[in-house]
């Protein structure tokens, strides 16, 4: 089939029926919308082109720089499109956690500016947040930049309303259940709105990451409230998945269906199957279920290798930090803000700030040391660098990630705690912050 431009390949992705012998659900037909078939590898190709297609000629004429807050698939798609049209692309982020994504953006000529966010998600009330910084940058020089604004731009979900949803309906007609990952919420909002207009009984189920866990492309339920195009009323349920279960779902998709989806796709697949096992009991007629396969597994090999090293024939302890599941650390001991001063005075703990180095330099708890969470997790896989006789207090942006470290060390016999509410609560309480010298 002949095409004249790469953008003509965006959309019209296949819909794959999952063999009932694989999912083993009675009276259920499961279909995977394979967004991996988009030319740049993910469902975000639709969003990037949907935002740019009516503006690109003017952007080129003005020689503007496309700018976005992205550390993933939207950034990759925008970088390719900018390169095709001979213009610059700049991404603002507070940390790119997947090395392959960083390398790919560099390969495609993107300019990457890494900023210290107090949180790993957009916070419009925080002037240090990357999204707020980006908006200030654009406002200061509006003629220079074109801000695609994926978190609030209606064209994000319109791309899925006008295309993805229509494609699914053209193939299947009425759909009973639709499952999707929640990041910007554009795909679930657009698809579900289109499908629900044609079948009012559609059930839309969103999937988020467990608090304190990291699944590329997914946010946790608290972070979703900070995404402008997220509308909670559209969802009949929102399911939570941790990284280990997401990888189990991903591996099942790969090995049993030949679908090379990444961790976010695995999260949706795992959550969907667990949910339908309960819901489908007693169904007498067939139900049609659709889920989105967001992107490909190859982007995330380093992420997978850390969490499932045995797949790569690497030997690590069975109780590795990366093997922790969400239920393990929910009850991890925390120090409440009103208890902090007394705790610091009586325990004299070693304070370990697990945020990125830039965030630490801008403001940190006095006498704390900085070991970013991804580095600390790697270190703990092979040993514990802290003295056993010393009490340890872990600090992170919101008090979620620090719980994992506190639980892990408590299990090893250490006195370890998490700062409840993290640095965000510390700042709200106007407690002392130190700034590192430049």
Identify the role of each PLM range.
Residues 393-398:
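Mid-chain, well-packed structural core segment of small domains
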Residues 430-438:
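Generic C-terminal helix-cap and adjacent flexible tail
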Residues 384-386:
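Short, basic/hydrophobic alpha-helical segments
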Residues 1-342, 347-350, 356-374, 378-382, ...:
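PLP-dependent amino-acid enzyme catalytic core
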